[in-house]
A protein has these predicted regions:
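Glycine-rich nucleophile elbow surrounding the catalytic serine of serine-hydrolase chemistry
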Residues: 119-129
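Conserved small/polar residues in nucleotide/adenosyl-binding loops
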Residues: 270-277
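Alpha/beta-hydrolase fold nucleophile elbow
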Residues: 110-121
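Hydrolase active-site cap/lid region
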Residues: 129-174
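Alpha/beta-hydrolase active-site loop
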Residues: 90-109
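A domain-start/cap signature at the N-terminus of enzymes
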Residues: 20-52, 160-164, 261-264
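The feature captures the conserved acid-bearing segment of alpha/beta-hydrolase catalytic domains
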Residues: 166-213
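C-terminal catalytic histidine-bearing segment of alpha/beta-hydrolase fold enzymes
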Residues: 212-218, 222-266
Length: 282
């Protein structure tokens, strides 16, 4: 009986090992693994020393673009993870694929069950829509100049991308009048779960206008009781993303992790010696 149990366990371990991926290079001095999952490109960068709880930050689009936050988190022991659903516009198919990918990361790689979601530009569509359906799996959200309303971007004027969106969502242009897939309209579950959001945006963004996207999210999220912070860059357009000094975003993300150890602030009381005590000590 013991031999049978041993063989079963060995088979399971061997099966898991077979799913592992060979190193394909390095990214900022750490091992990088590129592979496909459900026929889509994926990447994992493994820190030299993983932080407690195996935290990870997950991008659904634009790996290695303006990576100041990713680099800083990698140094602090985060796994940097990418799964390409860039051109799926936060569709139900994208959300379903993302959930399967998440389960693979937490089961096979033993990454934290609470993921930090990172959405740049159109990546915001996936981040918000996936979070709305998987609130228990999210530690926090970092979005940068995010698309939050498809009528703002790509919008009907961008004919090629608009038709691409319609095809992915299996909708007609007329059917979009009743579209229910915009992040700005699906914030209630995220706010109810109290998921913290931080966003970096340019106030002069002409591609994904702040007032039509993240500013709407900010006002509605606050009204729903959700915690949100926005860093607004004056005079900045859609690019460059992120911050030259990523510390405000990194600190925000670190504070939301399940294994984060809050600082204990201590006050050391000090009483100045009296002149008599001072004289006696001489």
């Amino acid at each position: 009986m013991k031999k049978i149990i041993y063989l079963v366990l060995l088979a399971l371990i061997t099966g898991l090992a077979a799913q592992a991926h060979e190193k394909t290079g390095e990214w900022n001095g750490c091992d990088r693994y590129d592979f496909t999952f459900k026929d889509r490109q994926a990447t994992i960068v493994v820190p030299k020393k993983a932080a407690k709880g195996n935290p990870w930050i997950w991008r659904p689009a634009f790996f290695d673009a303006f990576p100041s936050v990713d680099k800083a988190l990698l140094e602090k022991g985060f796994h940097i993870v990418y799964y390409d659903v860039t051109h799926l516009y936060g569709s139900p198919r994208a959300v379903s694929l993302g959930t399967e990918f998440y389960e693979n990361m937490t089961d096979l790689y033993n990454l934290s069950e609470k993921v930090t979601l990172e959405g740049f530009s159109r990546g915001g569509l996936f981040v918000f829509n996936w979070a709305a359906q998987n609130t228990e799996k999210v530690a926090c959200i970092y979005v940068d100049a995010p698309v939050c309303d498809v009528f703002s971007w790509p919008g009907r004027k961008n004919t090629a991308l608009w038709n691409d969106l319609l095809k992915e969502w299996n909708l007609t242009d007329a059917g979009m009048e009743h579209f229910k897939g915009n992040p700005i309209d699906n914030l209630a579950p995220i706010a109810a779960a109290g998921i913290p959001i931080i966003s970096v945006c340019g106030d002069s963004d002409q591609t994904v206008p702040y007032k039509e996207n993240m500013d709407v999210v900010r006002s509605r999220y606050l009204a729903a009781g959700g915690p949100v912070e926005v860093i607004l860059k004056k005079g900045c357009g859609h690019h460059p993303h992120s911050l030259d000094n990523p510390e405000p975003v990194v600190d925000f993300i670190l504070r939301q992790q399940p294994e984060y150890e809050k600082y204990i602030h201590c006050c050391l009381l000090y009483t100045s010696p009296s002149p008599r005590d001072y004289a006696a000590s001489r």
